């Protein structure tokens, strides 16, 4: 198989899955938070590939998934509604779109390393922007000639972040495995705008697509990550984390690629750069893991000393040091000696200084900004719909220049990291052929 375009797909059915019990009228209005209002209305997807070793019939799998999805939506009722005017969700039980697709190939054919980036697109509905009449959430069940199946769940980023997606899918999977018993879906914490109060007249446009970009994946084995951590320790960095060392390493490779692209295109000097890191606020705010919404913020640091890219030790210490300073500043906002409610409101006010939408303005600033989002340590590989554990978990979100997603990736009994990297087309060749990168990464 030379190209993913050779794969024939067949849509067998589309249906709307509604909550198994109607949502009370008193819960029909669910306010978006200030964070939600500043997020673009784009779908983000998580996809799970299962080999289905027990050979479950697809009709049985479909029925169980749909029934358990309906049951799960009773607790996650906003997901079955519609976002209105970037202000609130009308929880009208319209339902979640469920698409059943036959993919006419064997699963292993599209899970070859060179095709996995395309495989993640093949198993999801071909949709990115959430229109006013679109389902807030989507599901696609894909089944292959070999009997393998893939389950993709997508939801508007307007109402959910990665932690919310994980909570929902965990509950859905648990319900699927336990339909015959008295299992109750765990009750999610629907915080609405209680922490980050909604504001009137917040206008959020469409996602600033980056059409001249290309996305590729790179794998870092546990051994490669340990090598990076060992080097960081040699440089004098105390207790470096996996994400810290990989962030610094990828920034260096990307910056070198940027210098090379600027030189090849006669663009003069390359730009200084900023490192932007998305952060889950639940631990900082002492909120339950299954709190629903965009409970995230960002911390970032501008690296002015761009020449240090040529000196590995100085560059690594600079990036990790600056990120730790920015992270500490964010942590300190949540550690005030105030009562719980007052502390939440104070935190919300402080976060206005770190406006969650501000990093999108980097597109119009004379700086090379890299946005990192880590899904590491989220147990996506434990998701079991009664089909065993997934052989691969992927995520998909719209192309955004200099966006780098980090996820756990299984290497035997241990986990390395899979990096999904989006760069400008003219920068990617220099990046993926960088000898330093290739000494640590594989495809």
Curated annotation (Swiss-Prot):
GO terms for cellular component: cytoplasm; nucleus. GO terms for molecular function: O-acetyltransferase activity. Expressed in cortical cells of the root tip, especially in hairy roots, as well as in etiolated seedlings. Mostly expressed in roots, and, at lower levels, in leaves. The keyword RNA-binding does not apply. Pathway: Alkaloid biosynthesis. A motif (Nuclear localization signal) lies at residues 215-222. Belongs to the plant acyltransferase family. This is Minovincinine 19-hydroxy-O-acetyltransferase. It comes from Catharanthus roseus.
């Amino acid at each position: 198989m030379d190209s993913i375009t050779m794969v024939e797909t067949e849509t067998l059915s589309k249906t709307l899955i509604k909550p198994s019990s109607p949502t009370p009228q008193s819960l029909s209005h669910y306010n978006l938070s200030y964070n939600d209002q500043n997020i673009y209305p784009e779908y983000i997807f998580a996809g799970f590939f299962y080999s289905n070793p027990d050979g479950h019939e697809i009709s049985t799998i479909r029925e169980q998934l749909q029934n358990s999805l309906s049951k799960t939506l009773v607790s996650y009722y906003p997901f079955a509604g519609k976002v209105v005017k970037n202000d609130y969700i009308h929880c009208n039980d319209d339902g979640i779109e469920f698409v059943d697709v036959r993919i006419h190939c064997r699963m292993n054919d599209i899970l070859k390393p060179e095709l996995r980036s395309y495989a993640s697109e093949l198993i999801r509905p071909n949709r990115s922007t959430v229109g006013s009449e679109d389902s807030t959430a989507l599901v696609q069940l894909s089944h292959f000639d070999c009997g393998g199946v893939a389950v993709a769940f997508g939801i508007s980023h307007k109402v959910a972040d990665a932690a919310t997606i994980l909570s929902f899918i965990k509950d859905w999977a648990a319900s699927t495995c336990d339909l015959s018993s008295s299992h109750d879906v765990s009750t999610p914490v629907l915080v609405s705008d209680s922490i980050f109060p909604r504001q009137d007249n917040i206008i959020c446009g469409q996602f600033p697509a980056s059409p001249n970009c290309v996305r590729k994946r790179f794998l870092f084995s546990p051994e490669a990550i340990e090598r990076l951590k060992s080097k960081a320790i040699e440089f004098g960095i105390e207790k470096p984390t996996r994400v810290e060392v990989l962030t610094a390493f990828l920034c260096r490779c990307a910056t070198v690629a940027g210098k090379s692209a600027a030189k090849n295109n006669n663009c003069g000097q390359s730009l200084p750069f900023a490192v932007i890191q998305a952060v889950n606020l639940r631990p900082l705010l002492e909120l339950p893991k299954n709190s629903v919404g965009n409970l995230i913020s960002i911390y970032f640091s501008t690296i002015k000393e761009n020449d240090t890219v040529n000196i590995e030790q100085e560059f690594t210490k600079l990036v990790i040091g600056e990120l730790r300073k920015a992270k500490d500043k964010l942590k300190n906002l949540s550690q005030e000696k105030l009562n719980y409610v007052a502390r939440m409101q104070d935190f919300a006010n402080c976060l206005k200084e770190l406006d969650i939408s501000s990093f999108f303005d980097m597109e119009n600033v004379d700086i090379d900004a890299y946005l990192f989002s880590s899904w590491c340590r989220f147990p996506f590989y434990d998701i079991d719909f009664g089909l065993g554990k997934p052989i691969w978990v992927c995520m998909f979100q719209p192309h955004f220049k200099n966006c780098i997603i980090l996820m756990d990736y299984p290497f035997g009994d241990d986990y390395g990291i899979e990096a999904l990297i989006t760069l400008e087309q003219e920068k990617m060749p220099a990046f993926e052929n960088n000898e330093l990168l290739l000494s640590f990464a594989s495809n």
